[in-house]
Regions:
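C-terminal helical cap(s) of enzyme catalytic domains, especially alpha/beta-barrels
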Residues: 1-21
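A mid-to-C-terminal "edge-of-domain" accessory segment
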Residues: 14-143
Length: 143
């Protein structure tokens, strides 16, 4: 039912506020004792997440230009804001420096600190997954 609502909204056939849809889906998943898969479209934990350099760079550029509308739609058929979510840029082995700088800026660190950027970038390249916020915080405190 959730995907029907999303598609009806995208088609302009229904004008419901879908910002609470993720909460409703979680409630149904709990009631049915069936967890939502992280890769489930629009609602899953991985929806609207990227650590890939080229994807993140496009989102970062749109943010830098002040174009939040575009940032919310790049590489996404469904705007994250439609369902009360935001695009999330993470740092992993396929990330570029733009991911690192964006994360640093968003978390109150200096994105122009070249040593810090290099430390995080190199740590990400040595992994096979995205770095956690805790791991990034530790890397920020080193040095």
């Amino acid at each position: 039912m959730d995907m029907i609502l999303v598609n009806l909204k995208l088609l302009g056939a229904h004008d419901a506020d879908l910002s609470v849809l993720p909460e409703y889906c979680e409630l149904v998943a709990e009631a049915c004792q069936i967890p939502l898969v992280h890769s489930y479209p629009v609602i899953g934990a991985d929806a609207f997440r990227t650590a890939t350099g080229v994807h993140a760079a496009a989102i970062v550029k749109a943010h830098a230009k002040g174009d939040e509308w575009l940032a919310d739609r790049i590489y996404s058929a469904v705007p994250a804001s439609m369902v009360g979510r935001k695009q999330v840029i993470e740092i992993g082995p396929m990330s570029g420096l733009s991911n690192v700088k964006f994360w640093l800026r968003a978390n109150g660190y200096n994105p122009e600190d070249e040593e810090l950027c290099t430390r995080i970038f190199q740590a990400a390249k040595k992994t096979d997954r995205t770095l956690t916020k805790g791991e990034l915080e530790v890397l920020c405190k080193m040095g």
